[in-house]
Swiss-Prot record:
Biological processes per GO annotation: cellular response to hydroxyurea; mitotic DNA replication termination; regulation of DNA stability
Name of the protein: Replication termination factor 2
Spans annotated as Disordered: 195-271
Role of this protein: Replication termination factor which is a component of the elongating replisome. Required for ATR pathway signaling upon DNA damage and has a positive activity during DNA replication. Might function to facilitate fork pausing at replication fork barriers like the rDNA. May be globally required to stimulate ATR signaling after the fork stalls or encounters a lesion. Interacts with nascent DNA.
Pfam family, one: Rtf2
Modification comment: Undergoes proteasomal degradation, via DDI1 and DDI2. Removal from stalled replisomes and degradation are required for genome stability.
Localization, UniProt: Chromosome
Family note: Belongs to the rtf2 family.
Organism: Bos taurus
GO molecular function: DNA binding
Tagged with keyword Repressor: no
Keywords: Chromosome, Phosphoprotein
GO cellular component, one term: nucleus
Length: 299
């Protein structure tokens, strides 16, 4: 069996076998992870943030994602764990002085070195291109290489001096195992936050009840309110009449308090003549007119 030109085909050219799985280029994958936003697929530009799983985002893209209330969000699965802006940390990155960016190959006649990175480790000097493991601190956002944290063991950040714990260290663009560990940490953190809120609620209720009790039973106040003195005749009569009433209510049987007279006071004679206890009021019926009364009752 031949073809034009006298060629004899082989069997593997005629029989189609199973398709080979296409392998992803590792260099292209690293470039995509470390130079492009996971959410918008755009080039990373400051401010750059990272989530609790160690993925890199543009802060503008995260804000737009959170503000988008539509049911179908683009690439929502990549950021489904981000519920608020508090779930991301703004990174403090150190620039690489050897990185030229687009300025080095403006004409397109040079080879682009994909291994050259924009940022480096401020301690060791390793480039953040995916060849070395990098991590950041959730408390302050400083980025270091994992080698720097292992070689210089400290409980304080090497750049800003902020204290941190092991849970605050998050690996950037880690493996599947690293992502599983970070997911378990996220769940533990959220459980702690819920328990903290539940414990705060009864404390707030107790403080509110104590404040209500204190308002109902106030203590003695030493502040004197500046009220004007009452100078009218009616108010003075009320004061004189209220003294024996209060004494009788409290069970006080002193004769002086019960039989107090206006004649004992130091007021003027004109003022004393207004009351029935004055000598001018003790006249006989013949001396006083029948239509004149000194009080609300008749003699």
């Amino acid at each position: 069996m031949g073809c034009d030109g006298g060629t004899i085909p082989k069997r593997h050219e005629l029989v189609k076998g199973p398709k080979k799985v296409e392998k992803v280029d590792k260099d292209a994958e690293l470039v995509a992870q470390w130079n492009y936003c996971t959410l918008s697929q755009e080039i990373l530009r400051r401010p750059i943030v990272a989530c609790e799983l160690g993925r890199l985002y543009n802060k503008d893209a995260v804000i737009e994602f959170l503000l988008d209330k539509s049911s179908e969000k683009a690439l929502g699965k990549a950021a489904s764990h981000i519920k608020s802006i508090k779930n991301v940390t703004e990174l403090r990155l150190s620039d690489n002085p050897a990185w030229e960016g687009d300025k080095g190959n403006t004409k397109g006649d040079k080879h682009d070195d994909l291994q050259r990175a924009r940022f480096i480790c401020p301690v060791v000097g390793l480039e953040m291109n995916g060849r070395h493991r990098f991590c950041f601190l959730r408390c302050c956002g400083c980025v270091f290489s994992e080698r720097a944290l292992k070689e210089i063991k400290a409980e304080v950040c090497h750049t800003c001096g902020a204290a941190f714990q092991e849970d605050d260290v998050i690996v950037l663009n880690g493996t599947k195992e690293d992502v599983e560990v970070l997911k378990s940490r996220i769940e533990e953190r959220r459980l702690r936050a819920k328990l903290g809120k539940k414990t705060k609620k009864p404390k707030v209720a107790e403080s509110v009840s104590k404040s209500e009790v204190s308002e109902e039973t106030p203590g003695p106040s030493k502040v004197k309110t500046g009220k004007p003195e009452e100078t009218s005749l009616d108010t003075r009569e009320k004061k004189t009449n209220s003294a024996p009433k209060s004494a009788a209510a409290h069970g006080i049987t002193s004769g002086k308090a019960a039989k107090r007279s206006i004649a004992d006071s130091e007021e003027s004679e004109a003022y004393k003549s207004l009351f029935t206890t004055h000598s001018s009021a003790k006249r006989s019926k013949e001396e006083s007119a029948h239509w004149v009364t000194h009080t609300s009752y008749c003699f």
